[in-house]
A protein has these predicted regions:
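Conserved PLP-anchoring active-site segment centered on the Schiff-base-forming lysine
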Residues: 113-135
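Helix C-cap/helix->beta junction micro-motif
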Residues: 27-30, 138, 198-199, 229, ...
Length: 403
């Protein structure tokens, strides 16, 4: 008897760790060194967590062997609550904070608790593909609104408005954005929130990169602009504190919660079903949020992340036929390949061919639900010398590549 996967997974896709990665693993098993520019995982590139975070986790291990409250440790949730108080988010209490095994788990939970079959959720294109996958897995229908490359990758408000229907339940905002690195202006956020207000939409705001900002970029917390809207804000320690493997994230729920008691009960139920988040990692949250913010040293002038962002952007734009909007936040660049210079009809084939030829692993743009096969994403985490080598190989590859 053949055992098949569930029909629920028929349209679920997460190509950041998709079929091309399997080819990369096979090449590694054959002895090839693969430079992985496919995922924002700081630790393998030499970005280490602050010592005091590691020390506090170790110190608390003897008392972290049992379950915690399903929402998480009181001390960690209070630290998150105070974090949003400092960001001028109104009405967030201890019971409005849920800790999770990374933001990823919480995204899935929030969609499972909200959506019925056929409900629509507005998701940016390009997006972090887990949002699209989580909507689909919950029985919903992701509707992608365009972000405008010619306007620094800001969301196209007219496109959002045109795609709202009676079935639309929620609006997803990813700011700072992955894969583009865009950091949205207050004016753009206010425009998006006004559309949510007019159509009674729940707002999901993914802010995992809120501390990774370059040049004069300023992050505005979405919920601080909309005390009258139900807003779920997602964040965690993975990126800013370089502990992606700890799987430590949270949701903060703000706005008129009295109108959403049934939905919140659904989130409570799902939180209870998975018992609790990783308890040792919960002990990192209070120290991380309350301690010295070492991420600032990495993004200010002479900081390693800023230098690598600059180098990535300069080198990509130096390749004939390639253009890239300067990322103002996060850990990625999302360059465009001019189809007049190098026509690509299948971008998954492009990244596989690049892997086989140059031993570089990047991600095709369509993996981020971008509708055209003319972009790819690279991480800006490697050291400058490795970036020089990697992007030089991409340039040489494109000189002769044809589909």
């Amino acid at each position: 008897m053949q055992v098949s996967k569930s029909n629920k997974l028929a349209n679920v896709c997460y190509d950041i760790r998709g079929p091309v990665l399997k080819h990369a693993k096979r090449l590694e098993e054959e002895g090839h060194r693969i430079l992985k520019l496919n995922i924002g995982n700081p630790a393998p590139f030499g970005f280490e967590a602050p010592d005091e975070i590691l020390q506090d986790v170790i110190r608390n291990l003897p008392t972290a062997q049992g379950y915690s409250d399903s929402k998480g440790l009181f001390s960690a949730r209070k630290a998150v609550m105070q974090y949003y108080q400092q960001k001028q988010v109104e009405g967030v209490g201890i019971e409005d904070i849920y800790l999770g095994n990374g933001v990823s788990e919480l995204i899935v939970m929030s969609m499972q608790a909200l959506l019925n079959n056929g409900d629509e959720v507005l998701v940016p294109a390009p997006d972090y593909p887990l949002w699209t996958a989580a909507v689909t897995l919950a029985g919903g229908h992701p509707v992608h609104y365009l972000c405008d490359e010619g306007a620094d990758w800001f969301p196209d408000l007219a496109d959002i408005k045109a795609k709202i229907t009676p079935n639309t339940k929620a609006l997803v905002i990813i700011n700072p954005n992955t894969p583009t690195g865009a950091v949205y202006s207050k004016e753009v956020l206010l425009g998006m929130l006004e559309l949510a207000r007019q159509h009674n939409l729940v707002v999901f705001s993914d802010e995992i990169y809120d501390k990774i900002l370059y040049d004069d970029a300023v992050h505005v917390c979405t919920a601080s602009l909309a005390p009258d809207l139900l807003c779920l804000t997602f964040n965690g320690l993975s990126k800013s504190y370089r502990v992606a493997g700890f799987r430590s994230g949270w949701i903060a729920i703000s706005g008129p919660k009295h109108n959403a008691q049934s939905y919140i009960e659904g989130i409570d139920m799902l939180a209870n079903m998975r018992l609790c988040a990783n308890v040792p990692s919960q002990h990192a949250i209070q120290t991380a949020l309350g301690g010295y913010q070492s991420i600032n040293d990495l993004v200010l002038p002479q900081g390693r992340l800023l230098e690598q962002r600059n180098r990535t952007w300069e080198l990509l734009n130096a390749i004939p036929g390639v253009s890239c909007v300067k990322p103002m936040g996060a850990l990625y660049a999302f360059p465009r390949i001019d189809p007049k210079v190098c026509p690509i009809f299948n971008d998954e084939k492009f990244v596989l061919d690049l892997l086989l030829s140059e031993k570089l692993l990047v991600v095709q743009g369509t993996a981020f639900n971008w509708p055209w096969p003319d972009h790819f994403r690279v991480v800006t985490l490697p050291r400058v010398d490795d970036l020089d080598m990697a992007i030089g190989r991409i340039g040489n590859f494109l000189k002769s590549y044809r589909q």
